[in-house]
Structure formats: C-alpha cells, structure tokens
C-alpha cells in the first residue's frame, strides 16, 4: 500500500443537510483545500467531503500510474455518495479540482446544485506547459508547479517534480471539459486571481462566457496567486463561496435536484 504524505489525507466534516464536495489540484493534495473545507463547515455548518485524488499526496512514481479517468472517477464517486445523503449538493475545487468541478456539473447536472471553481483551467494552459507537451521526445518530468502563493512563508504540500505523462492527462481533461462547458446550467461562482503563474487568468472569462447558467458570477482576486485557497484571499473565498451556496439554498429550500 502506498504511503500517504502527512497532511494529504482525505477528510470529511459532518454538518447540516448541505453537502459540499471540495477537490484539490494537480500534483497537490487536500492540504491546499483543507482551510476552505474547514471554513465552510465552521462558518456555515456545511457537511464537507474532500477526497484524495489517485496518485496525489503520495509520490510522483505513484502519480505516473494514474490518469484523468482515475481522477474523474474518484471525484464522481465522492459526489454520488454525497448526493445520496444530502438535500443540497455543491462542488468547489482548486485548479484541476476546479476543472473537475466543471466536468461534474456538465455531465451530472441532476446531482449538482451550484459550483464554485477556483483558478480552474478550462481552455488555455501556460505557454511553458504547452512547449513541454510539444517536445519530441518530451522529458519524463519537469520541476514542480506547487506553491504559487503570494503570501510570504506559506507552502503548498505538492510534488517537487511533475510527471509529464500526467501533465498530458491534465491537458486532455481540460480539453474535454472545455467542450462540455455549454452543458452547465446550475448557478456558478467563478473565482480567479488576476495574477496567476500556473493557469492563465483568461480561463475565468472563457468559463463565464461558455456556460449557460442564468446565474454566473466572476470574482477576481487581487491579492493572491494560483493557490488562492492558501493565499491572502483565502478568507474572502470562504465567505464568498459559503455565502453563494447559502443563497442558492435559500432560493430553493427543497433542493434544485428535488425541483427538477
């Protein structure tokens, strides 16, 4: 059995009848979204589930045995479990976790009441990543992409190396999800740092313009980089995401899925 890094464990916090699935990003771990999940639970009383995606929070060697199908499957399993026991179900996620958030909302609209993707790639990757993927032959690994954080002294628990084969899997997931964005009809709060060195900020505008929900909001962060859930705007994110989900609950007390 592969050892899980300390701090990268999945977590679950039982609260009220509002369930929130919180998804971490590529090469990262639940450490990056633990404060978000805990904050949503403590401040709003939500029940929170945060799975550890396959190949994450262990080692790059372990990650190389996984791909986007595994990450999507784990996220979907957690969503279905949450939807089976909660009246309202919301999804939020950081980076690739945000992409998975969009993917789930597009494919499983009957299970998701609203979403809040944070720094989600859903179109363009950085030029640096595109150049690596275009190399022939491509390197086996490149330096890690974690800890793009503006706040001093804050470090993300993420791999120091990024398997290029898995980066290619992310690229496929992003492309597939981009083609599904028009199927998203639930309320959405899209969150993006204006200065992000991992995911081009233009992705947020592309997401907002592509999805077909009647309630789409865009929150720009002015004091954070990519890992915004650990950065200077982390409390703002908790308040805005929690407030947004609470607003959706108030508008449809029986749950959007029940109304459908």
Predicted ranges, named:
Residues 93-97, 101:
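Gly/Ala-rich beta-loop-alpha elbow adjacent to hydrolase catalytic centers
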Residues 223-260:
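Catalytic active-site module of serine/aspartate enzymes centered on a nucleophile-bearing elbow/loop
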Residues 36, 186, 200-209, 220:
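Short alpha-helix in the alpha/beta-hydrolase fold that links the catalytic acid
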Residues 54, 218-224:
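Short glycine-rich catalytic loops that host catalytic nucleophiles or stabilize transition states
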Residues 3-59:
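Short, surface-exposed "cap/lid" segments of acyl-processing enzymes
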